[in-house]
UniProtKB/Swiss-Prot annotation:
InterPro entries: 4Fe4S_Fe-S-bd, 4Fe4S_Fe_S_CS, NADH_quinone_OxRdtase_chainI. This is NADH-quinone oxidoreductase subunit I 1. It is a peripheral membrane protein. Its main location: membrane. The gene is nuoI1. It comes from Rhodopseudomonas palustris (strain HaA2). GO terms for molecular function: 4 iron, 4 sulfur cluster binding; iron ion binding; NADH:ubiquinone reductase (non-electrogenic) activity; quinone binding. One of its GO terms (cellular component) is plasma membrane. It catalyses: a quinone + NADH + 5 H(+)(in) = a quinol + NAD(+) + 4 H(+)(out). The keyword Cell membrane applies. NDH-1 is composed of 14 different subunits. Subunits NuoA, H, J, K, L, M, N constitute the membrane sector of the complex. Keywords: 4Fe-4S, Cell inner membrane, Cell membrane, Iron, Iron-sulfur, Membrane, Metal-binding, NAD, Quinone, Repeat, Translocase, Ubiquinone.
């Protein structure tokens, strides 16, 4: 009988203490600045997509959830013909963001990715591409790399050092 009263007193004391539970849809959780959530593809300041389909993100992905294929535009610029991420397999490690040389792929703090069907977690390029520049502002990859200058050989462009003669370095 005494054990029962002790239990009721313990429950009664906790009855008036503020609950620690957050009511999720009404109260959004506080995320850390470096939290990793939904993956997006960004555009450069000119409005063109930054991705050059180098396949580094797919190569570094530990679970292999990124699939893309390269196409070449009329001006010689590479772009992904299709870009697909399977969020059912993604572990949000951030390796793809670190490996991207153009800052095209970025992880946002958006974590609400719940779906009823598993195939709805496969995002295509049009689902991933956003209108803005994302976290890296003002970066134009194609202004510093990737395009040949007509009439100039390697090392002849402005701010470019001539190529190193590797055979001349041999003993």
């Amino acid at each position: 009988m005494i054990g029962w009263l002790e239990a009721m007193l313990r429950v009664g004391r906790k009855l008036f203490v503020k609950a620690e539970t957050q009511l999720y849809p009404e109260e959004k959780p506080k995320l850390f600045p470096r939290s990793r959530g939904r993956i997006v593809l960004t555009r450069d300041p000119d409005g063109q997509e930054r991705c050059v389909a180098c396949n580094l993100c797919a190569a570094v992905c530990p679970v292999g959830c990124i699939d893309l294929s390269k196409a070449v535009a009329d001006d010689g610029r590479w772009y992904p013909e299709h870009f697909r991420i399977n969020f059912a397999r993604c572990i949000f490690c951030g390796f793809c963001e670190e490996a991207c040389p153009t800052a095209a792929i970025q992880l946002t703090p958006d974590f609400e990715l719940g779906e009823w069907r598993r195939d709805a977690l496969v995002y295509e390029k049009h689902d991933l591409l956003i209108a803005g520049e994302g976290k890296v502002r003002g970066y134009r990859y194609w202004s510093v790399a990737g395009k040949a200058i007509d009439g100039k050989d390697k090392g002849c462009a402005e701010n470019e050092s001539p190529p190193v003669d590797l055979k001349g370095l041999l003993p």
